[in-house]
């Protein structure tokens, strides 16, 4: 056997798997931004919500039932770096058909910054390309939340497929 073939045979195998432990009828359904907020809060560490910025995604199926919530990034006091590849890999692995984004502002501000808006636009673009729509983006604090889709129009993807 040739050296190249021998090395190829020893290459790391990539295996994708996903198993949802909840029955379909037991999964919570998201019908509005408040439902999403309440679900996100159940998995948020209250000790960190005013300490460090975190970014999470909610994975939804065709019926807007929650498949799960994934923490994508955890950062400092006023920022975190979102790995776009990790975000969409998580969604694709779970066979999600829609996403809701959420992050907290440790300052308690519920205003979308310019960086928040640019990131939302970028993720909407990529989601459109992957046929995986980004449905909303929430900012969460101890005192409440703000929904991008409730206060502004979600960005329209510019990609032509």
Could you tell me what each predicted segment is?
Residues 1-22, 61-63, 77-161:
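Active-site-proximal loop/helix of nucleotide/amide-processing enzymes and allied scaffolds
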Residues 26-86, 90:
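Glycine-rich, small/polar surface segments that engage phosphate groups of diverse ligands
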């Amino acid at each position: 056997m040739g050296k190249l073939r021998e090395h190829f045979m020893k290459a790391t195998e990539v295996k994708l798997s996903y198993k949802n432990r909840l029955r379909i009828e037991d999964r919570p359904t998201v019908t509005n931004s408040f439902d999403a907020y309440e679900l996100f809060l159940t998995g948020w560490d209250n000790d960190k919500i005013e300490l460090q910025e975190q970014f999470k995604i909610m994975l939804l199926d065709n019926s807007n039932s929650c498949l799960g919530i994934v923490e994508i990034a955890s950062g400092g006091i006023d920022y975190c770096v979102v790995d776009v590849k990790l975000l969409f890999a998580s969604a694709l692995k779970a066979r999600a058909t829609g996403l809701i984004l959420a992050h907290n502002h440790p300052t308690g501000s519920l205003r979308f910054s310019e960086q928040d808006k640019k990131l939302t636009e970028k993720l909407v673009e990529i989601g459109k390309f992957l046929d995986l729509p980004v449905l909303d983006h929430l900012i969460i604090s101890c005192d409440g939340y703000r929904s991008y889709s409730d206060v502004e129009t979600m960005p329209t993807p510019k990609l032509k497929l």
